[in-house]
Amino acid sequence: MTKLTVAVAAAWLIAGCQHPKAPARVTGFQERAQEAGIAFRMHDLPKEQGEQFHINLYDHGSGLAVGDYDNDGREDIYFLNQLGGNALYRNMGDGSFVDVTAKAGVALPGRVSVAATFADYDNDGWEDLYVTTTRGGNVLFHNRGDGTFEDVTAAAGLRYVGHSQAAVFFDYDNDGYLDLFLTNTGRWTTDTFDSATGAYVGKADLGTTMTTPREFNRLYHNNGDGTFTDQTDRAGLRGRGWAGDVAVFDYDEDGFLDLFVPSMFGRGQLYHNSGHGTFTDVTAQTLGRTPYGAIGSKVFDYDGDGRLDLFVVDMHSDMWMGLDAQHLSLETARRTQHQRFLSPLGPTVDETTPGFTTTVRALFAKLGEDYNTLLFGNALYRNLGQGRFTETAAPAGLETLWPWGVATGDFDDDGNEDVFITSGMGYPFYYWPNQLMMNNGDGTFRDQAAALGIEPPTGGIYLEEKVGGKPAARSSRSAVVADFDGDGRLEIVTNNFNGRPYYFANRFPRRNYVEFRLTGTKSNRDAIGTVVRLWAGNKVMVRQVSPAGGYLAQSTRVVHFGLGDRSQVDSIAIRWPRGIMQTLRNPAINTLHEVREPAR
């Protein structure tokens, strides 16, 4: 999983990115982590091991999660760390945050934490917290309701020691309790720490990572009494291993939540939920080809047709970049960053290269993959209805380079959902900008990161320290979206690899909006899986209350609609997970509505 390629930063970026502070923007975003009181810094394992790369270096970074842990109506942030402990920041409601980690008891020092998700698994009205790690096992924290958490992992039946990635809570059998789906990668290290060398013991060499025995995914059924039972084999969800994320949505609208599980090394899988506790792989007849090296995935309606689409970002197919000793691929990458190629070798070879077809097909066959099931780049699956999709990433303008995490939201409140993509490698010393893909409203996107305050990064493109005598570049890994200050505009927060996070305060001109915080009664209390549709004149919009997703991240579960200049909403239709339909007529705009699931 670790990439030990070495590349140099692009000259066209260096010139504009070494100023200590990016200029203030009149519109767009403004980076304000320091001003907001967020002092967290993600530290990676080389700090523990000195400046020497070890195979156990986990360069996929750590995640973050958003949730209102203290029920004060404000979204709080939990940052994950590889070294030195995680951090929980309480939202004070005035644009600032306070570190409450020690009181809450959720630091988990000594672990290599990866991702986390807030969820009220026992429906007691308080958001609990589940954390995945690659050292010492995953942890379920029960929220006591007094600002503190209790480790109930063993009692809940969720003890798992391995190399876990994303975890999502969703109610797959519609019994009103949130079940847990856990993604895992491969056994690329042991769970042993060598105190003599300071190393987290790994495999012998990097080449073992793609073929090492895989850790399969897990599905835990919520028994409704605070415990869980492993139902993976019965459900048919072991998967193919090397999964780093999962997207949850009812793609065919049959009333049961389905799963898309991307793979870091191979084809992804769309699982159809039968409604009887089992899942079936329907990828071939629904999505067709899937990205070979997918990292993050997100569900949203990109074209405003009222149907939920699926976006998958593929980082590992860009590994051709920087593999040449002279780093000549840097300019090629800049020139071809929005193109898709025929293999992970990128533009260095194509179908005219002698032996290309035979060699590439043989390579994937050796890895147990069918070349004809793969594509090499991002994938945007447009939902055509009736369980059918068509892939549109390139024409939509969403083919990007070095993508990791993806977060979506209507950042300028114009009625169209935009996309934020974290990018770059950091190690090996290669900077690539984050992407802010603004929705044009016609099914296409344009990158406005530089124009709207996302790029260049505050403090320049390099980190303070060096690794192996060379400067390390900044690199964002995961991102979340939420209206942290309650002004109807969505902020973006990232967790950056071996660096400080970004807190992008929204400075777009104020426009009309409406928000809904949903509470389930018959359905799960978090209302995960609820679909909300809005009609305003001839405009229809759809949002889903989603669990974690996008790559090691959990964004807000508050449903946000930007309205642009529209002065009223005609109606809202809410489809709750257990099938109850609810309609709201002409709700007030520019406010947050609290909505409870009706009895019927």
Language-model regions, residue ranges each:
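Bacterial N-terminal signal peptides
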Residues: K3-G16
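Beta-propeller blade termini
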Residues: G61-N71, R90, S113-N123, H142, ...
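Beta-propeller blade repeat segments, especially FG-GAP/WD-type strand-to-loop junctions
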Residues: A22-Q30, G85-V100, G137-D151, T192-G207, ...
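Repeat-based blade/solenoid architectures
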Residues: I38-G63, G105-T117, G157-V168, P213-E215, ...
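Asp-box/WD-like beta-propeller blade repeats and closely related beta-sheet repeat scaffolds
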Residues: K103-T117, T134-Y172, L182-M210, R214-E215, ...
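Short, conserved, GDST-rich strand-edge loop motifs in beta-rich repeat architectures
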Residues: T185-T212, H316-T373, I421-Y431
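Hydrophobic beta-strand segments that make up the repeating blades of beta-propeller
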Residues: F29, R74-N81, W126-T133, L180-N184, ...
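Gly/Ser/Thr/Pro-enriched helix-cap/hinge segments flanking short amphipathic alpha-helices
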Residues: C17-R32, P46-G50, A396, Y427, ...
